[in-house]
Structures are given as structure tokens and as C-alpha cells.
UniProtKB/Swiss-Prot annotation:
The keyword Acetylation is assigned to this record: yes
Biased composition (Pro residues): 1-11
Annotated function: Specific inhibition of calpain (calcium-dependent cysteine protease). Plays a key role in postmortem tenderization of meat and have been proposed to be involved in muscle protein degradation in living tissue.
Underlying gene: Cast
Organism phylogeny: Eukaryota, Metazoa, Chordata, Craniata, Vertebrata
Protein name as catalogued: Calpastatin
Glycyl lysine isopeptide (Lys-Gly) (interchain with G-Cter in SUMO2) crosslink residues: K112
Family, as annotated: Belongs to the protease inhibitor I27 (calpastatin) family.
Biased composition (Basic and acidic residues): 38-49, 99-119, 246-256, 394-408, 419-430, 522-570, 661-726, 759-788
Length: 788
């Protein structure tokens, strides 16, 4: 612990070995602090030093001068390097005070400083090492810090080893070092000066120790292992640098307390009961409903479960009970009934259940008691008789007999009385004899098919389809044996069935008929007569969906026709946009409509007399809807729909306005075709003189005397002017029935096209015929020329 007093100023440039010395001092303090009585050791050391000093008063002054120089050198070193260890500075004044008996003041000062210090916390081993290195310090004062740092590190390692082994050895060494150190005589004046310098150095070192002590950690030094004595200078320097860093500062700082306003949570939870959980929450109106029991679903009655195939068979075959044919089966049943006996029910007990399930345990105990009571009432189980069958005995196949069981209905005895056939009797009660059976004739394929297909809702069998098969059979019979038989006849012969052999025990047909009569008449199934199409129609139902605009309600408001009203709010009557047109004839309308269609030259086009009529016709053409052709006559119900649609279309067409004139509308179709297809002229043989062969030139010299006469051309039949143009246009359309007036117009237009195409075809035919006549005439002329 440091001496109280003013703190000395810290040196600006601490040496490199200061940290090492500081750690060494800290280690020495801890090692010596463990001793039980440090004060007693210190007193004994002082007594020994005093006795040694008194026993050697007569030493030469040379030694005193050497010691003085030593002390001054050491004091100078301490002033230069104030970071020296406190152990060295403290050891020097103690030794100097003990050198001479005349120097009392330094002793008193040293005693005061030692008394103010705590119990000895330094180890005097360092003084021994320093006394040995005294002459070196005197001769070489500049190298003092390095030497002291190296020696300090060595002593630190040695002291660690000694402190671990024994503490007594550590306490004995400072006494020996003091005796060795006090052998040197000291002078009076020099000792006083040395004591003053050492005291000042001691105060400085103590003040520095007081500053550096709280920053040095104690625990890491103790935990470091012992290092080897022969350490390099670099390692020592690194150790010194590491020691200068100091310990870790405490970074755990407490957070500042919160000084803001108090935070409160005003939220709270409340439980709301749902309506109807308790009777008190039910409203009075709903209680009346609950008392009436209205709207409460009652459990459905148990619906009969669907029957399986086995159950259905058992239900149907319940009436067909058979009497036992023999008494053997009853004996077997008795024997088997004696074998089976009542067996005691096995009691199964489970492990002990947990404590929580007490109610279930009581129920299980009750069930076990009931089962035990029932099992006791049944009695004990009798042991089975031992089987004496030996293993060597084996069942032989010869002893195992096969028994045939008669089925119900095979014999007359097994048939129940209700289902037995009663023989037909006469009036007298005698049974009627059965009629002799006719020999079955061989049936053809067609007859067999007709009999088999009688049940499949078809017409009764007819004998007409059997005629070709009979003819084929006749043809095969007429063929001689040497000729080959065709394949068709062979098939007909092979397909004939063989004669049915009369089987014994077969039920006669009369019995089958009587059984069928007992069943009753079959009820007519309404679905049986329906065709397959009707069944499909029942599943797929046709639903009519209203289209947008069919009714006024479905028309959007933006597209509805708004009625024009007067100032008073009355609807205005539609004004006649144009003057009423005179009724037009059919011929006039046909000519006006067929103006754009190319027509043959036979039909003369009518000229319009007035401009008003032409304008009226153009409006009629623009306003009328496009004609639609119908292949068949429509149903009577659709005519009204068509009229309604026509009226709606007329109203829409009126709202569109007048149609702008089309410049290409009045052009004929021939011009359009000619624009696309350009005719090319090809020279034919004989058109020029150069192209005529020399063989035929002499014919030209005869001036056409030998030319054959041209056949008379057919005169084109001109229709009478009085003929109706409608009949002329509709000659080829007699087969197609006309449904409406609009279809007539389109048919007439088409007939014009067909007539024009036919006229052009007729013209081509005439050309071909003329060419053929020319070709025929040419070889005839050649033959005449050869004969001549």
C-alpha cells in the first residue's frame, strides 16, 4: 500500500521495463502477503542488520566512497527513470541508514516511512540481485534500465517457483541478502546525502505506484505458466508491451432510469354470453315457439334397407319349400345336435387402470360380475370323449360313397301339392288321354329366326322370306350327282337343324301352358312401347332462353325507341314522310329488282316513265330486308314470328336513313368480268393465205363450187311479247315451292342467271356443231378430189 501525501508528477517518457517491474512487484506482494506474520520477519531482519553494522565499524574509506558512488548512481538512475520498481528504492534507504551509527536522522525518516507503510508487501530478493550488479551500475550508468528489466523478469519467474514450493524459503532469502549488502562500510556525509536522494526517489515511486495500481490486473499474472530463464530480447519486449496495455475496463453500465410519464393500459376484457345458451337470455317471443315445438326437425322414420341379391333370392324362394325325401337326414341332424354343448364364456381381465377413470372401472366390474353369474348358470364344461382312431388307419376311397341328392321338382314326389299338375278330366271325371305328338319337321333358318325373335316386340313371323331358301333347296335337289353344288346352296343345306330326338322325362307343352296361364296376364308397360328417342327426350329438356331484344323489357334503355311527344305530353302521330305510292305491279317490281343482274337479250327491259317512281323503288330496295330462300315450307307457328321480325327490321332500317348512291351499282357485271380477263386472239389455220396448206389451195381456185352446203342454223325461238316475264323466269324453278314473296324475287333473279348461262351454253353447242360439220365436209372434199 502507498504512503499518503502529494502525488508526484508523472514522467512524460516511461521506460520499456516499467510494466515488467510493476508486474514483478505485484507478484511479490501477493506471494509475501500470504505469510501469517510479516511484521515479525521485518523486525528480525532489522536486528540482524544492526548487529552486522555495529560489528564492522572499521572499514577503509575507499569502500565508503564506492558505496557513495553506487548510491548516487542509483539515485540518478531513479531520477531519470521514475518507473523503477519500488522494491529497489525501498531497499536502498534501509541499507544506508544502517551503515553509520552517527547518522540518526536518516534512520528516523526510514523508520517513519516503514511504519506508515502496510505490513511488508515487498520481497527483498531484488536487493540481493541489485547488490551483485552494483559495480556494473557504477561503471555503466546508461545501461541501467535494460539490465534491471532483464533481472526483474528473471526474478519474477524464480519467485513464482519458490512461492509455489515453500513460503519459508522466500522469507529466509531477504535476511541473507541484507547481511551481504551491509558488509560494505559507509561514510557519514555521503550516507546522509544518499539518504536524502533515496527518500525523494522513494516518494516519487510510491506516488507512481499509487497511480498505476488500480489499472493493473492481478489474476492474469498468477495464471501464467513459468517461462524458461533463457528468453530472447524480442520475447521480453513483447511481454513488456503486452503488460502496458492494462486490464479490461468495465463496460457494463447501468441504463439510466426512466423519468417519463407513467404508461397505463386502459383496455379490459368483458365476457358476453351468447343469446340462447342460458334460459334467462332467451327472449319471450322465442320461448313461445319452443313451447309449440314448431320447426323442430323430428327424426326420420327408419327407411327399409336395400335388399341384397342373397336376401332377394331367399324371399322369392321361401314358397318353394321341399319335403324331406328320406329319414336319414333327420338322424344325421340328431347326431350332430348331440355333439354341440354349451361352453363357458372366457373371462378377460385387463390391467389396473389409472385413478382418473373410476366410473369406467365400476361399470367394467359390474359387467364382469354379470358375466360370471351367467357362466356359473351354464355349468361346467364336460370333457370331450377321447378319440380312439389310430394314426395308421386311413380312409379308403372305396368306402366313400357318392350320394345324389334329389332336387326339388325333379320327381313328382318332390313337387309341392300346390304346384302339382292336375290332369285334365272329362265331364264324367275320366282323365283325358294325351294326343299323339306330331313328328317335328325340320325347320329352315328363317323359321327358326322367326320363332326365336317372336318375343322381341316384332311383327309375327311371315312366310315370305322363307321362299328363297325353299327355292334354293329345290335347286339343289334338282342338280345331278355329277355336277358341283354352289356354295350358297351348301350353306343352306348345312344350316338346317337335325331332327329333335324325343327325350324321356321332358315336361310336355301342355304343362308349360297351364303354368303360364296360372301366372296371369302381363301388364302393359307404357315405357316398353316407347321408342328410344322418347326416352332421350324425357331426360334432355328443351328450355327456351329469351334473347336480347325479343321483348321490350330485354331491350337496353339506350336502344329503346323514344316516342316523340307534344308540348302537352301527347305522343305525336307519325307524319307521312312521302306521298303514298301507287300500287306497283309484279312485273314492274321484278324489272326494278333485276336491274343489276345480267339478263339475256330475249327479255326486253322496261323504261321508267317518271323519276319519282325510280326514287321510290330505290327506297323500297334499300328498306326491305335481304330475301331469304327456304328449302321447305315453314310451320304455321313461325309465320307470325317472321312477321314480327320483319316489322322490327323495317323500323331499324327506317332509323338508318337513306342509302348513299353507289357509283359501281349501275355497272353491268359483264364489264367487271372483262376488266379482269383480257381476250387474246390466236390465229387459226386458214384465216390467212399464208396459213393455207398447198393441198387445199386448189379448192379455193374453184370459187367454192365444191364447197359443201352449210347446215341450216337453228332459229332462236323468240318468246311472244304477250308472255308473262314471271313465267319465263320461273320455268326451271317449278319444282321448288315458293314460300314468301321475298323468296320469289330471289328465285327469279337466280332463274335469270341460269337462263343467261344456258343461252351461252346453247351458243357454244351451236359453235361446236358447226365445227363438226366443217370437219366432216373436209374429208369428203378430199375423197372427191382423189377420185377425180
Amino acid at each position: 500500500m502507498s504512503q499518503p501525501g502529494p502525488k508526484p508528477a508523472a514522467s512524460p517518457r516511461p521506460s520499456r521495463g516499467a510494466a515488467a517491474r510493476h508486474t514483478q512487484e505485484h507478484v511479490n506482494e501477493k506471494n509475501i502477503g500470504s505469510s501469517s506474520k510479516p511484521g515479525e520477519k521485518k523486525g528480525s531482519d532489522e536486528k540482524k542488520a544492526a548487529s552486522l553494522g555495529s560489528s564492522q565499524p572499521s572499514r577503509p574509506h575507499v569502500g565508503e566512497a564506492a558505496t557513495a558512488t553506487k548510491v548516487t548512481a542509483s539515485s540518478a538512475a531513479t531520477s531519470k527513470s521514475p518507473s523503477m520498481s519500488t522494491t529497489e528504492t525501498k531497499a536502498i534507504p534501509v541499507n544506508k541508514q544502517l551503515e553509520g551509527p552517527d547518522q540518526k536522522r536518516p534512520r528516523e525518516q526510514a523508520v517513519k516511512t516503514e511504519s506508515k507503510k502496510p505490513q511488508s508487501s515487498e520481497q527483498p530478493v531484488v536487493h540481493e540481485k541489485k547488490s551483485k550488479g552494483g559495480p556494473k551500475e557504477g561503471s555503466e550508468p546508461k545501461n541501467l534500465p535494460k539490465h534491471t528489466s532483464s533481472t526483474g523478469s528473471k526474478h519474477a519467474h524464480k519467485e513464482k517457483a519458490l512461492s509455489r514450493s515453500n513460503e519459508q524459503m522466500v522469507s529466509e532469502k531477504p535476511s541473507e541478502s541484507k547481511t551481504k549488502f551491509q558488509d560494505v562500510p559507509s561514510a557519514g556525509g555521503e550516507s546522509v546525502a544518499g539518504g536524502g536522494t533515496v527518500a525523494t526517489a522513494l516518494d516519487k515511486v510510491v506516488g507512481k505506484k499509487k497511480e498505476q495500481k488500480p489499472f493493473t490486473p492481478a489474476s492474469p499474472v498468477q495464471s501464467t505458466p513459468s517461462k524458461p530463464s533463457d528468453k530472447s530480447g524480442m520475447d521480453a519486449a513483447l511481454d513488456d508491451l503486452i503488460d502496458t496495455l492494462g486490464g479490461h475496463e468495465d463496460t457494463n453500465r447501468d441504463d439510466p432510469p426512466y423519468t417519463g410519464p407513467v404508461v397505463l393500459d386502459p383496455m379490459y376484457s368483458t365476457y358476453l354470453e351468447a343469446l340462447g345458451i342460458k334460459e334467462g337470455t332467451i327472449p319471450p317471443e322465442y320461448r313461445k315457439l319452443l313451447e309449440k315445438n314448431e320447426g323442430i326437425t323430428q327424426p326420420l322414420p327408419d327407411s327399409p334397407k336395400p335388399m341384397g341379391t342373397d336376401q332377394a333370392i331367399d324371399a322369392l324362394s321361401s314358397d318353394f319349400t321341399c319335403s324331406s325325401p328320406t329319414g336319414k337326414q333327420s338322424e344325421k341332424e340328431k347326431s350332430t345336435g348331440e355333439i354341440f354343448k354349451a361352453q363357458s364364456a372366457g373371462v378377460t381381465r385387463s390391467s389396473v387402470p389409472p385413478k382418473e377413470k373410476k366410473r369406467k372401472v365400476e361399470e367394467e366390474v359390474i359387467n364382469d360380475q354379470a358375466l360370471q353369474a351367467l357362466s356359473d348358470s351354464l355349468g361346467t364344461r364336460q370333457p370331450d370323449p377321447p378319440s380312439h382312431v389310430s394314426q395308421a388307419e386311413q380312409v379308403k376311397e372305396a368306402k366313400a360313397k357318392e350320394e345324389r341328392q334329389e332336387k326339388c321338382g325333379e320327381d313328382e314326389d318332390t313337387v309341392p301339392a300346390e304346384y302339382r299338375l292336375k290332369p285334365a278330366k272329362d265331364k264324367d271325371g275320366k282323365p283325358l288321354l294325351p294326343e299323339p305328338e306330331e313328328t317335328s319337321k325340320s325347320l329352315s333358318e328363317s323359321e327358326l329366326i322367326g320363332e326365336l325373335s317372336a318375343d322381341f316386340d316384332r311383327s309375327t313371323y311371315q312366310d315370305k322370306p322363307s321362299t328363297p331358301a325353299e327355292k334354293k333347296s329345290n335347286d339343289t335337289s334338282q342338280t345331278p350327282p355329277g355336277e358341283t353344288v354352289p356354295r350358297a346352296s351348301m350353306c343352306s343345306i348345312r344350316s338346317a337343324p337335325p331332327k329333335l330326338a324325343s327325350l324321356k322325362g321332358v315336361v310336355p307343352e301342355d304343362a308349360v301352358e297351364t303354368l303360364a296361364g296360372s301366372l296371369g296376364t302381363r301388364e302393359a308397360d307404357p315405357e316398353h312401347e316407347k321408342t328410344v328417342e322418347d326416352k332421350v327426350k324425357e331426360k334432355a329438356k328443351e328450355e327456351e332462353h329469351e334473347k336480347l331484344g325479343e321483348k321490350e323489357e330485354t331491350v337496353p334503355p339506350d336502344y329503346r325507341l323514344e316516342e316523340v311527344k307534344d308540348k302537352d305530353g301527347k305522343p305525336l302521330l307519325p307524319k307521312e314522310s312521302q306521298e303514298q305510292l301507287a300500287p306497283l305491279s309484279d312485273d314492274f317490281l321484278l324489272d326494278a329488282l333485276s336491274q343489276d343482274f345480267s339478263s339475256p337479250a330475249n327479255i326486253s327491259s322496261l323504261e321508267f316513265e317518271d323519276a319519282k317512281l325510280s326514287a321510290a323503288i330505290s327506297e323500297v330496295v334499300s328498306q326491305t330486308p335481304a330475301p331469304s330462300t327456304h328449302a321447305a315450307a315453314p310451320l304455321p307457328g313461325t309465320e307470325q314470328k317472321d312477321k314480327e321480325l320483319d316489322d322490327a327490321l323495317d323500323e331499324l332500317s327506317d332509323s338508318l336513313g337513306q342509302r348513299p348512291p353507289d357509283p359501281d351499282e349501275n355497272k353491268p357485271l359483264d364489264d367487271k368480268v372483262k376488266e379482269k380477263i383480257k381476250p387474246e386472239h390466236s390465229e387459226k389455220l386458214g384465216e390467212r393465205d399464208d396459213t393455207i396448206p398447198p393441198e387445199y389451195r386448189h379448192l379455193l381456185d374453184n370459187d367454192g363450187k365444191d364447197k359443201p352446203e352449210k347446215p341450216p342454223t337453228k332459229k332462236t325461238e323468240k318468246p311472244d311479247q304477250d308472255r308473262d316475264p314471271i313465267d319465263a323466269l320461273s320455268e326451271d324453278l317449278d319444282s321448288c315451292p315458293s314460300t314468301t314473296e321475298t323468296s320469289k324475287n330471289t328465285a327469279k333473279g337466280k332463274s335469270k342467271k341460269t337462263s343467261s348461262s344456258k343461252a351461252s351454253k346453247d351458243g357454244e353447242k351451236t359453235k361446236d356443231s358447226s365445227k363438226k360439220t366443217e370437219e366432216v365436209s373436209k374429208p369428203k372434199a378430199k375423197e372427191d378430189a382423189r377420185h377425180s
